[in-house]
């Protein structure tokens, strides 16, 4: 049977889409999500003060992403609307990170299968529980694949290097300052594309976006750490 000019098998199309999405994600600077004694910490290498990679979704749920900003921003806002409507129609306790992760997985899977161009995004959805054992972290990739992560996860271009550092230094129940030190240290190990591979990088507060889900807070547990509060925590990390 003669194939038409320009024909590509389904397997080749999947490979091409995957390669395209991975290359786009690899250009993004990494994000780290890890547990600490009172919740879940989000740390992104992000020099922009307005284009956020980290966001609150609902009371106990937050979101982090790397890749093409307009694509993950569309997913973020859709997730907020979905969780708000679920909480309004049913009960706030029915709003879970698992439901949000499943919705994102279906959306990303459909886009990957049906569209010529896949989304160039990698996402983390996290929910803080009443204890460390109840914390939930889900990682979602461009094709809708979903993974249940324990303790920590890194996404973005240098995620393999960053993950190696997290495996060595993260432990359950770390104080906030220590968890931030572990996260920043891991991000400095991962070198974004286009930067020299030699020499130790230093990440200051101006180059970091930091937020947390704090189980000791009431109702809305997400909080950004900015300005003097972040600088003070970074000073503690450099002193340890």
Curated annotation (Swiss-Prot):
According to its UniProt record, in which pathway does this protein act?
Answer: Protein degradation; proteasomal Pup-dependent pathway
Q: From which lineage does this chain's organism come?
A: Bacteria, Bacillati, Actinomycetota, Actinomycetes, Frankiales
Query: What is the recorded name of this protein?
Result: Proteasome subunit alpha
Gene encoding the protein = prcA
Q: How is its activity regulated?
A: The formation of the proteasomal ATPase ARC-20S proteasome complex, likely via the docking of the C-termini of ARC into the intersubunit pockets in the alpha-rings, may trigger opening of the gate for substrate entry. Interconversion between the open-gate and close-gate conformations leads to a dynamic regulation of the 20S proteasome proteolysis activity.
Q: Offer one example of a GO biological process linked to this entry.
A: proteasomal protein catabolic process
Name the keywords, alphabetized. Cytoplasm, Proteasome
Q: May I have one GO cellular component term? A: cytoplasm
Q: What Pfam families would the database entry show?
A: Proteasome
| HAMAP family, per the entry | Proteasome_A_B (MF_00289_B)
| Assembly with partners or alone | The 20S proteasome core is composed of 14 alpha and 14 beta subunits that assemble into four stacked heptameric rings, resulting in a barrel-shaped structure. The two inner rings, each composed of seven catalytic beta subunits, are sandwiched by two outer rings, each composed of seven alpha subunits. The catalytic chamber with the active sites is on the inside of the barrel. Has a gated structure, the ends of the cylinder being occluded by the N-termini of the alpha-subunits. Is capped by the proteasome-associated ATPase, ARC.
């Amino acid at each position: 049977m003669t194939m038409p000019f320009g024909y590509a098998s389904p397997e080749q199309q999947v490979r091409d889409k995957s390669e395209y999405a991975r290359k786009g994600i690899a250009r993004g600077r990494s994000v780290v999500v890890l547990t600490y004694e009172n919740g879940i910490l989000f740390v992104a290498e992000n020099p922009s003060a307005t284009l956020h990679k980290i966001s609150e979704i609902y009371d106990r749920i937050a979101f982090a992403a790397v890749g093409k900003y307009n694509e993950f921003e569309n997913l973020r806002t859709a997730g907020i609307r979905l969780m708000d409507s679920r909480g309004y129609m049913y009960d706030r306790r029915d709003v879970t990170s698992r439901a949000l992760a499943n919705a994102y997985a279906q959306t990303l899977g459909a886009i990957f299968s049906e569209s010529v161009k896949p989304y160039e995004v990698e996402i983390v959805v996290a929910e803080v529980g009443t204890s460390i054992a109840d914390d939930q972290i889900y990682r979602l990739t461009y094709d809708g694949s979903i993974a249940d992560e324990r303790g920590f996860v890194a996404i973005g271009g240098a995620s393999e290097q960053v993950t190696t550092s997290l495996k060595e230094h993260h432990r359950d129940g770390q104080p906030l300052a220590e968890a931030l030190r572990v996260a920043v240290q891991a991000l400095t190990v991962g070198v974004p594309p286009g930067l020299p591979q030699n020499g130790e990088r230093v990440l200051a507060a101006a180059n970091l976006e930091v937020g947390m889900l704090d189980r000791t807070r009431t109702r809305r547990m997400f909080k950004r750490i900015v300005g003097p509060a972040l600088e003070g925590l970074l000073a503690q990390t450099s002193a340890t």
